């Protein structure tokens, strides 16, 4: 199990294959993604790496966090995320990862926070059909109708689809294809859409339901190695 990457969603565009097929892609940017600290079985009971991405202003970082960054000899980071890894894939503190961590044709899982929609009704939130336009219905055309039974069970069951807050929740989109990568500019192009608005942070991991293809760098795609090639 390898580490993932922290990236920022730039936006969507499209590219054309050699046979002229148009492919919609989401552009993800990897910016100064470094290992800030590590976790070990002896000390923490599990193996993981803590990655940081983006450069934060020192005034916006707490004093304990500043001490951690200083100990790791890395710049203060805007986003910190921990990734579980296999012991043989543990990285040294200060290692900077690049977009070459993934290869074209590979499948990845992307986790992000969806765009918040506020309070939404049943038709928008759950795709309900609504009530009749006529036949005695008035005012309640877009309502979701009945919410339960009668005295027995005498309650609305938990999880009932009703109007409420929509969006602004963590979602993972699985099995997205990596169309291409640009290690020099730190760009990853994945086929299809990714949760979140432009500029939001997303986590990119190897797909859990797909086999890793040959040629994937182990333990990770390090920036120094990518630039040396």
Curated annotation (Swiss-Prot):
It comes from the Bacteria. Keywords: Methylation, Ribonucleoprotein, Ribosomal protein, RNA-binding, rRNA-binding. GO terms for biological process: translation. Methylated by PrmB. The modification N5-methylglutamine is found at residue 151. The keyword Ribosomal protein applies. Disulfide bonds: none annotated. The keyword Ribosomal protein applies. It holds the Pfam family Ribosomal_L3. Belongs to the universal ribosomal protein uL3 family. This is Large ribosomal subunit protein uL3.
